[in-house]
Amino acid sequence: MPEETQTQDQPMEEEEVETFAFQAEIAQLMSLIINTFYSNKEIFLRELISNSSDALDKIRYESLTDPSKLDSGKELHINIIPNKQDRTLTIVDTGIGMTKADLINNLGTIAKSGTKAFMEALQAGADISMIGQFGVGFYTAYLVAEKVTVITKHNDDEQYAWESSAGGSFTVRTDTGEPMGRGTKVILHLKEDQTEYMEERRIKEIVKKHSQFIGYPITLFVEKERDKEVSDDEAEEKEDKEEEKEKEEKGIDDKPEIEDVGSDEEEEEKKDGDKKKKKKIKEKYIDQEELNKTKPIWTRNPDDITNEEYGEFYKSLTNDWEEHLAVKHFSVEGQLEFRALLFVPRRAPFDLFENRKKKNNIKLYVRRVFIMDNCEELFPEYLNFIRGVVDSEDLPLNISREILQQSKILKVIRKNLVRKCLELFHELAEDKENYKKFYEQFSKNIKLGIHEDSQNRKKLSELLRYYTSASGDEMVSLKDYCTRMKENQKHIYFITGETKDQVANSAFVERLRKHGLEVIYMIEPIDEYCVQQLKEFEGKTLVSVTKEGLELPEDEEEKKKQEEKKTKFENLCKIMKDILEKKVEKVVVSNRLVTSPCCIVTSTYGWTANMERIIKAQALRDNSTMGYMAAKKHLEINPDHSIIETLRQKAEADKNDKSVKDLVILLYETALLSSGFSLEDPQTHANRIYRMIKLGLGIDEDDPTVDDTSAAVTEEMPPLEGDDDTSRMEEVD
């Protein structure tokens, strides 16, 4: 800037220049900054703007008790002035300024307590963007500047200039340039390869990213050109003036001639008036643009903000083309102080559970200075769809990842954010239509929360919605289910599966539906993981109807009948277990079947058929767990079914009847399929079925028209039974 150059060229008699050595640690830090390559050099501007904002905060605070402090300048603002001719970038504020002692102490001779700690962190691979936390953010100026000049004026002292090219020392002198009134001007003499930071587009981009919500106006001064219509003579005059300016810069003194030309031009103008021809010329002017017009909406009172304002802010924050579904705006005060503005989007992103993608849904600010947008410590994974802003008053500026993980403040903020999100969901649940939209998009997140978040499991379980055997096309909450429970019903019954139709027609729900007991249909894969953690709701245990030991409400007479049936079919159960060997753990008489002859249930702590299917579908599954989790199958038979009764008679008549073995295996394999399991050897099962079809159609096994290949296959199969037993086979069928 011209005024600075003048002051630097003053003779030594008029001003005293004092030279100071940097304190050893600061010199070391500057050397580290200058000689190491950092990709995110842009943070220098954030640091300087933050420093300006702090200086403005201080003068504003002082003026509250003494308004005369602002007599030296009432406006509180920050200006950014790029100068391409001088290759400088200047940041000016009207803050508190610095005295001579402040300049010497703050910028060089007294190391901040964090200087050494920061250097150690930096050498250990920490990110340079955390520098502000250690109180040495000013030195980031040397990431882009070869020389830095600081001109400052404090109300209690004269105007001083500080300057250093980072060679181990700095100078301080009285500044006789243009009076500032009050404040600080930081002039960065940029390195040759860092001129991008004089570009309007780049400055705007950095300010929007890091300092958009600083509480004071940030104005960018840019020299621009515009077309101006003038007469020929005016155009010539302009050209002459530009030539004179060039001569001046080269050291040629031609001032008298400029005055003559100017006066002649004015006389000519008066004489000729509008007769001159018009001509368009390029005129340079300084354009001033405020870069942070979007005021931090979260600092305002929620009662004063309209839905439209929230909507506009949400769209500018997320670039979403749709309106948000719900919003929660709150502040926490007391020992800890922070504000938050949280939004629920209308739809879930397609990559919601993509682990490798960095989430940048929550922007973390510290005293309105942007810190980071991918702070995973703020929210648990199941709330990764929440968008918004968190602004803390207590966290240190530019906090590092390592410190975040140990920060007690952050843990308290996180706890409060989760609590407020759950409040928001419960408020949303009061509006059935909106909650339906929310649940369609984010039900998986709620269920993941139940699996992961033990502290909030109860509150999350109240948000669950399911189809049931009594709800029709409407999803109901567990609370609704409990209000409809029968008097003697102790448990909440549920079944997991692939589709609503599949579970509704399942053999497992037959007796429950017959007795008018409501069954919850869980048809999403994540439900399996959810119910592993959700053991009970409002004192009622959740019971899977596909597992062993199902207890149904029954009177004494029913219990007595069941015991009689167990005794009657005890022998058949033993025979079937001997035939199936290790395929099943046990064969028992069922209390859950009505129309199906048999079904396969799993042990209480083993996987359900649905869970087994989910695990098998996982590409990176651990096969070692498949053995002990999936093997515990129990075959339950229906004592009231004609197939089972006839099979009992057949087995008791002749224990060695070959057809009994074949029929038992066929029943078992069919039960596997109908219970949701997959067959280990589907081809063998298919061949058994084809043989049954042949018997049903009366096709003779020895018929020469039978295809040779199928005959070869059937030779490997155990025979169904002798020809003389065909009629009995058909009877069973």
Swiss-Prot record:
Residue numbers bearing the Phosphotyrosine modification: Y314, Y493
Residues holding ATP: N51, D93, K112, F138, R401
Gene coding for it: HSP90AA1
CDD domains linked to this entry: HATPase_Hsp90-like
Listed GO CC annotations: cytoplasm; melanosome; mitochondrion; nucleus; plasma membrane
Subunit annotation: Homodimer. Identified in NR3C1/GCR steroid receptor-chaperone complexes formed at least by NR3C1, HSP90AA1 and a variety of proteins containing TPR repeats such as FKBP4, FKBP5, PPID, PPP5C or STIP1. Forms a complex containing HSP90AA1, TSC1 and TSC2; TSC1 is required to recruit TCS2 to the complex. The closed form interacts (via the middle domain and TPR repeat-binding motif) with co-chaperone TSC1 (via C-terminus). Interacts with TOM34. Interacts with TERT; the interaction, together with PTGES3, is required for correct assembly and stabilization of the TERT holoenzyme complex.
The protein, known as: Heat shock protein HSP 90-alpha
Molecular function via GO: ATP binding; ATP hydrolysis activity; ATP-dependent protein folding chaperone; nitric-oxide synthase regulator activity; TPR domain binding; unfolded protein binding
